[in-house]
Amino acid sequence: YRRQRQMCIRDRIRYCVEKVAHRIPVVAGTGSNCTETAVYLSQEAEKIGADGLLVVTPYYNKATQNGLYQHFKMVADSVKLPILLYNVPSRTGTTLQPETIVRLCRDVENIVGVKDATGNISQTAHLMSIADGCVDLYSGEDAIIVPMLSLGAKGVISVLSNVAPQETHQICSLYFEGKVKESCELQLKAVPLVEALFCEVNPITVKKAMQ
């Protein structure tokens, strides 16, 4: 079963890479709670032609911070592609602490940043206060894109953008143009849709909204 699942994920990555055809970068999700599987998927994504990797914190196992460090380092050492860590404790049951994120970004050349879906602004502020420019931050929470941008996020890796791509792009572009008030207004306008997209288990509602 594990090999079948790995092949299924690999084939989806290949499909995306071929469809995109270098028009935009493809960041492939290759995370797993099994280090061997995460390494295999990351290497396959690199062979296929992905431009970067998004590697989620191992779920269910609840590793220590040192265990998480070793897991991500082994994955990163197996490829040359840039890697974004994916910190989403609501789904994995494990939080990648700010100190561990900074340690990984400093120690491992191709670990470049994090998709932060903690929803914990205080924790994110602490992360950026100790990062000293070594962590590229991306929001993983659509309801707080603007607050994350204010802490130094470079953008958002978004669920909302699947159904409202233009609006999601505008939230970020307006902010970066210095039109913070307009960006905030668009952010607040999007909140009901964000909440609706999570009224059931993701991605059920997203798929329905895209039909």
Regions from the PLM with identified roles:
Residues 206-211:
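Scaffold signal of the M16-like zinc-metallopeptidase fold and its non-catalytic homologs
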Residues 39-53, 71-81, 98-112:
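Alpha/beta enzyme core
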Residues 25, 29-33, 58-59, 86-91, ...:
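Active-site beta-loop-alpha junctions enriched in small/polar residues
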Residues 77-78, 91-198:
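Catalytic alpha/beta core domains of metabolic enzymes, predominantly
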Residues 10-28, 69-85, 130-132:
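Alpha-helix-loop-beta-strand connector modules within alpha/beta enzyme cores
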Residues 1-9:
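Single conserved hydrophobic/aromatic residue that forms the stacking wall/gate
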